[in-house]
Amino acid sequence: QIINIDGSGNRLSESLFGPKRVYYVIGKNKIAPDLSSAMDRARNIACPKNAARFNKKTPCVVSDDKKCYDCNSPERICNAILILERPCTGMEVEMVFINEDLGY
């Protein structure tokens, strides 16, 4: 399974429809043992760090614990979540695993 979180959905839509081939480059820090752990990592580690990178003033950025509050902030960057189980019809997906931490 691949989890992808986006603010406007434009990157998610391209993961589902459009190109015939999609490549994912995945660092070792992005691999989780199960879906629950992956969602927790994405929402409570990656999203707050990415929101901070964009200088957003969301609860996950301004709070001391830097975790997701499932907020309604207009600056929220995690409005859409995609869980890709298998490639969509007519699309090829290739995953490239890199043995180092990449991104958040």
Show which residues each predicted segment covers.
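Conserved phosphate- and dinucleotide-binding cores of soluble alpha/beta proteins
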Residues: 2-104
